[in-house]
Amino acid sequence: METWQEVTVHVHRDAQEAVSHVLIETGSQGVAIADSADYIGQKDRFGELYPDVEQSDMIAITAYYPSSTNLADVIATINEQLAELASFGLQVGQVTVDSQELAEEDWADNWKKYYEPARITHDLTIVPSWTDYDASAGEKVIKLDPGMAFGTGTHPTTKMSLFALEQVLRGGETVIDVGTGSGVLSIASSLLGAKTIYAYDLDDVAVRVAQENIDLNQGTDNIHVAAGDLLKGVSQEADVIVANILADILVLLTDDAYRLVKKEGYLILSGIISEKLDMVLETAFSAGFFLETHMVQGEWNALVFKKTDDISGVIGG
């Protein structure tokens, strides 16, 4: 029987996606996220009984490594990278790292138990790929395999990106998804009526994972996934460009985004911590965009910009 090594990192909720990425980069074969907010949000939804869970801003991210992995080296690297994230201004909280060994079937049971279907927006619900789910009339279901470690789509930055897509897509658009990760924003765009979606990620693992998640969802063969460094070398114009990545990276793509977004089109930027907000706004305004919508959840911000000559109801530019 193959055995696995489990490493659990306790961090602030705002660091969920960044820390998950760190764990995958150190060789984890999957992650599971335990968040008290998920339990509290589910409580009383259908009258089920849930254990009492104390609300906390700290979450537990558990990563699974093959038995051959040198955990001492992995944990040292994790601690170094978490310290670096904190130096960038990301709130990571008081970090603790635990580890243990477990059998393969225990891993399969452990990481799946954390995930439940989650209604994210008015129309969109994210459902784990192994779950049978009966959608209501008009409900659009995104199937994801969270075991692939790019998150379940419930992080505030992803939620706000999905809200923004729901706000701007009317059907028939061309969408570019920069830093696609799990592919959730591309899948949502397809379900919301976009005609063609181009999804790019610098990470080859993300490209593979995104394609696997896309394949789980029917009617998404209009999504084209490829490796790419932001928007470098892209010539395809788009009605909507969406990027849910760190603010320091977002500012590197705004000029290219302005070049590619069609007139009256939109640029959706998410993944912005509050202290980086002004930097992103100034960069987008300098590129020529006008701000149409500003969303906030906790320390995270998402912005919807428009490329337009009609500046009524918009800000900046």
From Swiss-Prot:
Thylakoid recorded as keyword: no
One GO biological process term: methylation
Top-level lineage group: Bacteria
Principal location class: cytoplasm
Binding, S-adenosyl-L-methionine: T158, G179, D201, N244
Classification via Gene3D superfamilies: Vaccinia Virus protein VP39
Enzyme Commission designation: 2.1.1.-
GO cellular component: a single term: cytoplasm
GO-annotated molecular function: protein-lysine N-methyltransferase activity
Subcellular location: Cytoplasm
Swiss-Prot/TrEMBL keywords: Cytoplasm, Methyltransferase, S-adenosyl-L-methionine, Transferase
Reaction catalysis annotation: L-lysyl-[protein] + 3 S-adenosyl-L-methionine = N(6),N(6),N(6)-trimethyl-L-lysyl-[protein] + 3 S-adenosyl-L-homocysteine + 3 H(+)
Family of this protein: Belongs to the methyltransferase superfamily. PrmA family.
Task performed by this protein: Methylates ribosomal protein L11.
Stated name of the protein: Ribosomal protein L11 methyltransferase
Species in which this protein is naturally found: Streptococcus pyogenes serotype M12 (strain MGAS2096)
